[in-house]
A protein has these predicted regions:
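Short metal-coordination and nucleic-acid-contact micro-motifs, chiefly zinc-binding Cys/His arrays
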Residues: 4-6, 20-23
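Short cysteine-rich clusters marking metal-coordination/redox-active sites
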Residues: 10-13, 24-27
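Proline-aspartate-enriched helix->loop->beta-strand connector
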Residues: 158, 162-168
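Conserved nucleotide-binding/hydrolysis micro-motifs of P-loop NTPases
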Residues: 31-32, 97-99, 123-127, 135, ...
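Short Cys/His-rich micro-motifs in 6-15 aa windows
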Residues: 28-38
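The Walker A/P-loop phosphate-binding site
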Residues: 48-139, 155
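Flexible beta-alpha connector loops of hexameric P-loop NTPases
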Residues: 66-67, 141-148, 176-190
Length: 216
């Protein structure tokens, strides 16, 4: 039995929505959402199959090339990341509160002073971030800071600034308008992480997400 499913897709960045919206929350463009209908067919075993999708390829036919990695200006960081940070990748920097994740993330950006970077914080104000950066005494010439808890506004800033690396600190302190749930809830964290990953892949911008891990 066939079943049609309707969704709306942004023609500019590929973001999806279950309903028609005027402004894309990912790329910020207006009037780019178009209706897309997919047909799902129920199988005899009770499963479903999609008529549209990726096709299987022989491994030897897949074209692959070595990714250009970003030098983190640290031999230890480069080693942990397999030789550097891959553009479009998402890295989770997790740990218990208070162990220095935010300081480490800021140090990473300040080591990359020759590159344009963005530090988006939902925990500290711009003044607090500047004071902490001055204590680290690194190169902040091309470092942008943003005190914001809205995922949409953070991604808008990334689109505007076009940094080569973005830190979001922390994933538990930001929220998206696309779902009705409190900031820090599991549904918000999952949705925000998924949206950031989608944006990173589409725009080829690497992100480092700071995440708190509680004993509970």
């Amino acid at each position: 039995m066939a079943k049609n499913t309707t969704k709306y897709v942004c023609s500019n960045c590929g973001a999806q929505s279950p309903q028609m919206i005027g402004r894309c929350p990912v790329c910020g463009e207006w009037g780019t959402y178009e209706e897309e209908v997919s047909t799902t067919i129920s199988t005899k075993k009770g499963g479903t199959s999609l008529r549209r999708g990726a096709q299987a390829q022989r491994l030897r036919e897949v074209e692959a090339q070595e990714e250009m990695r970003i030098d983190m200006q640290s031999s230890e960081l480069n080693r942990v990341l397999g030789g550097g940070l891959v553009p479009g990748s998402l890295v989770l920097l997790g740990g218990e509160p208070g162990i220095g994740k935010s300081t480490l993330a800021l140090q990473v950006l300040m080591k990359m002073g020759h590159r344009k970077t963005l530090y988006a914080s939902g925990e500290e104000s711009a003044k607090q971030l500047k004071i902490r950066a001055e204590r680290l005494a690194g190169d902040a010439e091309n470092l942008y800071i943003l005190a914001e808890t809205s995922l949409e506004r953070i991604l808008d800033s990334v689109t505007e600034i076009q940094p080569e690396l973005v830190v979001v600190d922390s994933i538990q302190t930001i929220g998206t308008e696309s779902i009705e749930a409190s900031i820090g809830s599991l549904s918000q964290v999952k949705e925000c992480a998924a949206r950031i990953l989608q944006y990173a892949k589409e725009k080829n911008v690497p992100f480092i997400i700071v995440g708190h891990i509680n004993k509970e």
